[in-house]
Structures are given as structure tokens and as C-alpha cells.
């Protein structure tokens, strides 16, 4: 079955190539049209107008988290499970393909709860259907599959992928796509972006406790090949008028935090940024939790990341327990609280 999934990914990669005959002839790229004026695009990827389908809706995880999303108030409009099209689940229509679901429900986002061997193919299917946003929660997707997905993402401009191996994205009070506990979030002023799911929840709880709340929270995931990075989110947070402060939670491995520091410095933003970097005592060459959390070749150390962030004017916390109070202190120092 894994080989079948690999072949499907390869076929979809060909279809996603804009120069291929399949792409130019496919009706999927022209069938979704707005009648009347469409709502304005969300400031940070999602808002109350986001219409979401669930890929893998009839599975255990898909069922549970779709129920949670509906209860939170997310506009869940349908689901996709091959060979179960035409049925209903949780009161929502189920379709065989993402393309069918998009036509019938006018969905513009998808959340993927599909087992690792088939998750990349599910992402590619959503890309072929030209959804605006795909959020992949699945952990353990083979890296060679994600390399193909990453290459396909670079060949198109319509679809944004958040994840994989991430908690998802939430705009408190409006839209929850993912596995995060909704009740700890509160509409507010802080944009949160993180490579760690549990540390995201910690930052959310603390910013809620000090009365600042959150504008949008994005878990970008800890895998080496993900769809959305710190820079993508920071650009949105800097431009978003609702976001008055930013929390960035990074970890060892890669150069994503250094890239974020460069953007913050170049942007000249006056919005306060507070960061925490996990893995300060991690030994080189040993993976720490996430697949991407590894110091190799002398690069990706916590010390390097902390130095780069401080040089960009970011306030760096030594403990994750101090994220909320640190942000509140910075707000008070700048007369924002």
C-alpha cells in the first residue's frame, strides 16, 4: 500500500506541474468560481470565513477532532474518505475526493488526519484541487514523500501547507483547525508561532493568564520539511493590525530561527517579540524529540539561535514558564499595557 501511495504522489506531482499537458487540460483548475464578491483574505491564514473540510474524517482522529472543531465554531463543511462518498458523518457530507468536496461545499481549507504512508498523497490531492490552505497534523510521514510535496509546493502559488507533524492553527473565537485545546485560547493581541506543539499551549495559557490573549496561533511543526516557516508567519503578524506582540518558540536544528531573526531586523518592526529556544543543553548529533531537532555539523545550536535573535532586538526567555510575564513586562515598558 505504501508503494501505491508513492506512485500516487508521483502522478500528482506531474499534474501539479503548470507546464504539463495534464495541468493545462485539467478542469479542476477552473471549476471553482465565486459568485458575487468573495470575503477578504484572512490576515493570518484563517478567520471566521474559512470553510474547512477534513481528509480522513471517518477515522478515529478525524472524527474526534472534527467534533471538537464544530463545537468550537469552526465552519466545517464536509469530509473526504475514498469509497465513502455520498454518505454523512457527524452531520457533514462525505466525498470521495477533495475536488468533489470543494465544488459542493465551496471549501477553501483542509485538515489532514490520514495515516503516514498516505498523508503526502492527501496533501498533494488538496493542492491539485487548489485549496488555499492545507493543515497536516500527521506525524511520521516518510521524508522522501515530503521532499516531493515540498518540490510541488514550490511549483505553485495557490496552496499554503501548514505542517506536517504540527498542532495546527487557531484564530481564537473564530476558527480552530487542528488538535489544540480550544478552551485555553482567548481573543487578544499576541501572535504565536512555534515549532513545538506543547510549548505552544504553554505560551497560549500564559498569555491568556496575563490578560493579553492571542490574535492567531500557528504551530508550524518540527519536521525537517514543512510547508510554512517562521518567516512566513512573521510577515503576516507584522502586517496584521490585531497582532501587537509576537511570541516565537524555536528549538535546536536547522536555521529557521536565524532566518526569523534576519527578517525581524530587516523589517524594522516596532512590535515586541519574545522568544524561547528549546534544547540549550542538547548534545550534538542526537535527535531531541522532533525529526528536525538535531545539532549537526556544528550548526543549529541553541546558543547560535539565541545570539541571532538578541542581535535582532528580540527578548529571549531562559525558561518557558516566563513567556507570558516577559511579554507583559515588555508591553508595560513600551506603554502598551
Curated annotation (Swiss-Prot):
Binding residues for substrate: 201
Q: What class of enzyme is it?
A: ligase
| Pathway(s) where this gene product acts | Carbohydrate metabolism; tricarboxylic acid cycle; succinate from succinyl-CoA (ligase route): step 1/1
| Compartments (UniProt record) | Mitochondrion
Catalytic activity annotation: succinate + ATP + CoA = succinyl-CoA + ADP + phosphate
Question: How does this protein assemble?
Answer: Heterodimer of an alpha and a beta subunit.
Q: Where does CoA bind?
A: 58-61, 84, 137-139
Family matches, as SUPFAM superfamilies: NAD(P)-binding Rossmann-fold domains, Succinyl-CoA synthetase domains
Q: In which tissues is it expressed?
A: Expressed in roots, stems, flowers, leaves and fruits.
Q: Which Gene3D superfamilies match?
A: NAD(P)-binding Rossmann-like Domain (3.40.50.720), Succinyl-CoA synthetase domains (3.40.50.261)
What NCBIfam families does UniProt report for this protein, alphabetically?
PRK05678.1 (NF004230), sucCoAalpha (TIGR01019)
Summary of the function given for this chain in its UniProt record: Succinyl-CoA synthetase functions in the citric acid cycle (TCA), coupling the hydrolysis of succinyl-CoA to the synthesis of ATP and thus represents the only step of substrate-level phosphorylation in the TCA. The alpha subunit of the enzyme binds the substrates coenzyme A and phosphate, while succinate binding and nucleotide specificity is provided by the beta subunit.
The top of its lineage is:
Eukaryota, Viridiplantae, Streptophyta, Embryophyta, Tracheophyta
Cite a single GO MF annotation.
Answer: succinate-CoA ligase (GDP-forming) activity
User: In which broad location class does this protein mainly occur, judging by the first location in its UniProt entry?
Assistant: mitochondrion
Q: What is this protein called?
A: Succinate--CoA ligase [ADP-forming] subunit alpha-2, mitochondrial
Cross-referenced HAMAP family: Succ_CoA_alpha
Swiss-Prot/TrEMBL keywords: Ligase, Mitochondrion, Nucleotide-binding, Transit peptide, Tricarboxylic acid cycle
User: What are the catalytic residues?
Assistant: 290
From its record, what is one biological process in GO terms? succinate metabolic process
Feature: transit peptide = 1-35
User: Family assignment?
Assistant: Belongs to the succinate/malate CoA ligase alpha subunit family.
What EC designation does it have?
6.2.1.5
What's any one GO cellular component for it? succinate-CoA ligase complex (ADP-forming)
Q: Which Pfam families does the UniProt entry name for this protein? A: CoA_binding (PF02629), Ligase_CoA (PF00549)
Amino acid at each position: 500500500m505504501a508503494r501505491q501511495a508513492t506512485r500516487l504522489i508521483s502522478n500528482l506531482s506531474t499534474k501539479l506541474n503548470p507546464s504539463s499537458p495534464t495541468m493545462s487540460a485539467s478542469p479542476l483548475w477552473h471549476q471553482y468560481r465565486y459568485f458575487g464578491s468573495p470575503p477578504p483574505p484572512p490576515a493570518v491564514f484563517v478567520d471566521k470565513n474559512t470553510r474547512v473540510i477534513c481528509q480522513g474524517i471517518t477515522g478515529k482522529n478525524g472524527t474526534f477532532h472534527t467534533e471538537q472543531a464544530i463545537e468550537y465554531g469552526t465552519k466545517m463543511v464536509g469530509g473526504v474518505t475514498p469509497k465513502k462518498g455520498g454518505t454523512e458523518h457527524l452531520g457533514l457530507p462525505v466525498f470521495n475526493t477533495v475536488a468533489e468536496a470543494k465544488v459542493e461545499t465551496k471549501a477553501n481549507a483542509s485538515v489532514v488526519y490520514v495515516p503516514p504512508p498516505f498523508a503526502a498523497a492527501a496533501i498533494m490531492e488538496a493542492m491539485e484541487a487548489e485549496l488555499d490552505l492545507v493543515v497536516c497534523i500527521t506525524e511520521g510521514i516518510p521524508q522522501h514523500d515530503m521532499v516531493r510535496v515540498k518540490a510541488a509546493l514550490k511549483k505553485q502559488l495557490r496552496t499554503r501547507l501548514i505542517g506536517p507533524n504540527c498542532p495546527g492553527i487557531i484564530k481564537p473565537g473564530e476558527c480552530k483547525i487542528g488538535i489544540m485545546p480550544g478552551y485555553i485560547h482567548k481573543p487578544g493581541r499576541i501572535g504565536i508561532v512555534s515549532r513545538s506543539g506543547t510549548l505552544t499551549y504553554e505560551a497560549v495559557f500564559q498569555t491568556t493568564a496575563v490578560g493579553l490573549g492571542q490574535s492567531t496561533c500557528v504551530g508550524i511543526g518540527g519536521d525537517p520539511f514543512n510547508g510554512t516557516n517562521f518567516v512566513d508567519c512573521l510577515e503576516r503578524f507584522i502586517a496584521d493590525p490585531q497582532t501587537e506582540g509576537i511570541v516565537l518558540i524555536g528549538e535546536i536544528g536547522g536555521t529557521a530561527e536565524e532566518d526569523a531573526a534576519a527578517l525581524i531586523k530587516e523589517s524594522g518592526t516596532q512590535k515586541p517579540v519574545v522568544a524561547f529556544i528549546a534544547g540549550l543543553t542538547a548534545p550534538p548529533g542526537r535527535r531531541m524529540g522532533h525529526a528536525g531537532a538535531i545539532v549537526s555539523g556544528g550548526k543549529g545550536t541553541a546558543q547560535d539561535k539565541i545570539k541571532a535573535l538578541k542581535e535582532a532586538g528580540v527578548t529571549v526567555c531562559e525558561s518557558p514558564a516566563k513567556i507570558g510575564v516577559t511579554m507583559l513586562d515588555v508591553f508595560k515598558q513600551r506603554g502598551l499595557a
